[in-house]
Regions:
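Peripheral interaction segments used for macromolecular assembly
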Residues: 1-121
Length: 121
């Protein structure tokens, strides 16, 4: 089923992972490293956006609510309505620790930071 922007609503995770994330001006601020799924609510809990670091060292991983990312075919990237500095100030953790305690602690912080509507009940 097409969305209002003409895209279908179904997308493979393998197409999302590795896609660049840009700010509204088209500047690259990171890329989607992973998707965290919520098996209880059958939803994407958040996309993991990584940036910073050199050769994999010092990279920060930010849980970004899926609803916050918007794919822009002109940029061939997901666009987030934040600057790199705002993303740097967002909640972050090691990629392994993002799922600690079922991910709910960092999930709540991320949804608050991005002012995203919670999907869970």
């Amino acid at each position: 089923m097409p969305t209002t922007s003409g895209h279908t609503t179904a997308i493979r995770a393998s197409r999302v992972i590795g896609t660049e994330v840009k700010d509204n001006g088209g500047n690259v601020i990171g890329k989607v490293e992973d998707l965290i799924l919520d098996k209880t609510d059958n939803a994407i809990m958040f996309a993991v956006v990584g940036f910073g670091g050199v050769l994999g060292m010092g990279e920060k991983f930010h849980p970004v609510p899926w609803s916050t990312l918007d794919f822009d075919p002109e940029f061939n990237a997901y666009v987030i309505p934040l600057s790199k500095e705002q993303l740097e100030a967002a909640p972050a953790d090691s990629i392994k620790d993002l799922t600690k305690n079922d991910g709910s602690g960092i999930r709540d912080k991320a949804y608050d930071y991005y002012k995203a509507e919670p999907y869970w009940h």
